[in-house]
Protein backbone atom coordinates (compact mmCIF):
# COMPACT_ATOMS: atom_id res chain seq x y z
CA UNK A 1 0.00 0.00 0.00
CA UNK A 2 3.05 2.27 0.07
CA UNK A 3 2.60 3.64 -3.46
CA UNK A 4 -1.05 4.57 -3.09
CA UNK A 5 -2.40 7.98 -2.13
CA UNK A 6 -5.01 8.57 0.56
CA UNK A 7 -7.21 9.86 -2.27
CA UNK A 8 -6.75 6.76 -4.43
CA UNK A 9 -10.02 4.80 -4.78
CA UNK A 10 -8.11 1.50 -4.85
CA UNK A 11 -6.41 2.27 -1.54
CA UNK A 12 -9.68 3.41 0.04
CA UNK A 13 -11.37 0.22 -1.17
CA UNK A 14 -8.66 -1.92 0.42
CA UNK A 15 -9.03 -0.06 3.71
CA UNK A 16 -12.80 -0.50 3.68
CA UNK A 17 -12.35 -4.25 3.14
CA UNK A 18 -9.78 -4.41 5.93
CA UNK A 19 -11.49 -2.22 8.55
CA UNK A 20 -15.24 -2.74 9.03
CA UNK A 21 -17.44 0.36 9.15
CA UNK A 22 -14.58 2.73 8.30
CA UNK A 23 -16.22 6.18 8.26
CA UNK A 24 -16.01 8.06 4.97
CA UNK A 25 -14.74 11.09 6.92
CA UNK A 26 -11.75 9.24 8.40
CA UNK A 27 -8.35 9.07 6.68
CA UNK A 28 -5.54 6.52 7.04
CA UNK A 29 -2.37 7.53 5.19
CA UNK A 30 -0.20 4.86 3.58
CA UNK A 31 1.84 2.98 4.43
CA UNK A 32 -0.35 1.49 7.15
CA UNK A 33 0.31 -1.79 8.94
CA UNK A 34 -2.07 -3.90 11.03
CA UNK A 35 -2.49 -7.51 12.17
CA UNK A 36 -6.09 -8.14 11.21
CA UNK A 37 -7.99 -4.90 10.59
CA UNK A 38 -11.31 -6.20 11.85
CA UNK A 39 -10.36 -5.25 15.41
CA UNK A 40 -10.02 -1.55 14.55
CA UNK A 41 -12.91 0.83 15.21
CA UNK A 42 -12.57 4.47 14.14
CA UNK A 43 -14.93 7.35 14.86
CA UNK A 44 -15.79 10.12 12.42
CA UNK A 45 -13.07 12.53 11.20
CA UNK A 46 -10.15 10.46 12.54
CA UNK A 47 -6.81 11.16 10.84
CA UNK A 48 -4.07 8.50 10.94
CA UNK A 49 -0.78 9.76 9.50
CA UNK A 50 1.76 7.71 7.54
CA UNK A 51 3.63 4.62 8.69
CA UNK A 52 1.44 3.72 11.67
CA UNK A 53 1.23 0.18 13.04
CA UNK A 54 -1.91 -1.12 14.79
CA UNK A 55 -1.58 -4.66 16.20
CA UNK A 56 -5.24 -5.47 16.72
CA UNK A 57 -5.34 -8.86 18.45
CA UNK A 58 -7.95 -7.15 20.65
CA UNK A 59 -10.08 -4.13 19.79
CA UNK A 60 -8.48 -0.77 19.08
CA UNK A 61 -11.11 1.96 19.40
CA UNK A 62 -10.34 5.55 18.40
CA UNK A 63 -12.88 8.29 19.05
CA UNK A 64 -14.07 10.95 16.62
CA UNK A 65 -11.89 13.94 15.69
CA UNK A 66 -8.71 12.26 16.95
CA UNK A 67 -5.38 12.88 15.20
CA UNK A 68 -2.73 10.15 15.12
CA UNK A 69 0.77 11.34 14.18
CA UNK A 70 3.19 9.51 11.88
CA UNK A 71 4.88 6.31 13.03
CA UNK A 72 2.51 5.81 15.98
CA UNK A 73 2.37 2.21 17.20
CA UNK A 74 -0.69 0.83 18.99
CA UNK A 75 -0.21 -2.62 20.48
CA UNK A 76 -2.84 -4.92 21.99
CA UNK A 77 -0.72 -8.14 22.24
CA UNK A 78 0.99 -8.90 25.52
CA UNK A 79 3.35 -11.68 26.55
CA UNK A 80 4.08 -13.04 30.05
CA UNK A 81 7.00 -11.53 31.96
CA UNK A 82 8.07 -14.94 33.26
CA UNK A 83 10.49 -16.57 30.81
CA UNK A 84 9.08 -20.07 31.43
CA UNK A 85 5.58 -18.90 30.56
CA UNK A 86 6.91 -17.25 27.39
CA UNK A 87 8.11 -20.64 26.17
CA UNK A 88 4.47 -21.57 25.59
CA UNK A 89 3.28 -20.08 22.32
CA UNK A 90 0.51 -18.09 24.00
CA UNK A 91 -0.27 -14.50 23.30
CA UNK A 92 -2.72 -12.39 25.23
CA UNK A 93 -4.31 -9.23 23.91
CA UNK A 94 -5.88 -6.35 25.79
CA UNK A 95 -8.01 -3.64 24.13
CA UNK A 96 -6.77 -0.09 23.61
CA UNK A 97 -9.19 2.84 23.67
CA UNK A 98 -8.38 6.40 22.63
CA UNK A 99 -11.09 8.98 23.31
CA UNK A 100 -12.51 11.75 21.16
CA UNK A 101 -10.63 14.92 20.17
CA UNK A 102 -7.21 13.51 21.09
CA UNK A 103 -3.86 14.20 19.49
CA UNK A 104 -1.27 11.41 19.60
CA UNK A 105 2.15 12.82 18.66
CA UNK A 106 4.41 11.17 16.11
CA UNK A 107 6.34 8.10 17.17
CA UNK A 108 4.25 7.49 20.29
CA UNK A 109 3.72 3.92 21.46
CA UNK A 110 0.42 2.92 23.08
CA UNK A 111 0.78 -0.30 25.09
CA UNK A 112 -1.80 -3.08 25.60
CA UNK A 113 -4.82 -2.38 27.79
CA UNK A 114 -4.40 1.40 27.87
CA UNK A 115 -7.31 3.84 27.82
CA UNK A 116 -6.62 7.45 26.85
CA UNK A 117 -9.45 9.78 27.80
CA UNK A 118 -11.19 12.41 25.71
CA UNK A 119 -9.35 15.59 24.65
CA UNK A 120 -5.89 14.29 25.61
CA UNK A 121 -2.56 15.16 24.04
CA UNK A 122 0.22 12.56 24.03
CA UNK A 123 3.66 14.00 23.28
CA UNK A 124 5.73 12.79 20.36
CA UNK A 125 7.82 9.74 21.19
CA UNK A 126 5.94 9.00 24.42
CA UNK A 127 5.35 5.44 25.60
CA UNK A 128 1.92 5.16 27.19
CA UNK A 129 1.87 2.24 29.64
CA UNK A 130 -1.02 3.34 31.90
CA UNK A 131 -4.41 4.98 31.48
CA UNK A 132 -4.53 8.74 30.91
CA UNK A 133 -7.58 10.64 32.28
CA UNK A 134 -9.70 13.04 30.20
CA UNK A 135 -8.29 16.48 29.36
CA UNK A 136 -4.65 15.68 30.16
CA UNK A 137 -1.30 16.19 28.45
CA UNK A 138 1.11 13.26 28.92
CA UNK A 139 4.71 12.98 27.76
CA UNK A 140 7.79 10.82 28.25
CA UNK A 141 8.89 7.22 28.59
CA UNK A 142 6.91 6.07 30.42
CA UNK A 143 4.32 8.77 29.71
CA UNK A 144 3.38 10.89 32.70
CA UNK A 145 0.64 13.47 32.99
CA UNK A 146 2.22 16.92 33.09
CA UNK A 147 -0.91 19.02 32.85
CA UNK A 148 -4.69 18.70 33.02
CA UNK A 149 -6.91 21.22 31.33
CA UNK A 150 -9.92 21.00 33.63
Language-model segments: residues:
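Generic structural signal for beta-strand residues in well-ordered domains
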Residues: 19-21, 67, 89, 129
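Conserved short histidine dyad/triad with adjacent acidic residue
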Residues: 27-29
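Flexible, glycine/small-residue-enriched loop-and-beta-strand segment within the central core
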Residues: 32-42, 47-115, 141-150
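Short glycine-centered segments of the SAM/dcSAM-binding site in methyltransferase folds
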Residues: 65, 119, 137
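Beta-rich strand-turn-strand
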Residues: 105-131
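Acidic, glycine-centered active-site loop in nucleotide-sugar glycosyltransferases
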Residues: 133-134, 139-142
Amino acid sequence: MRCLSTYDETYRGLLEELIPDLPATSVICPPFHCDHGDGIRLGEHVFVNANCTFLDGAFITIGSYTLIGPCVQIYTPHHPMDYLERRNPKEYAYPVTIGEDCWIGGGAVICPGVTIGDRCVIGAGSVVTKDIPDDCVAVGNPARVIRCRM
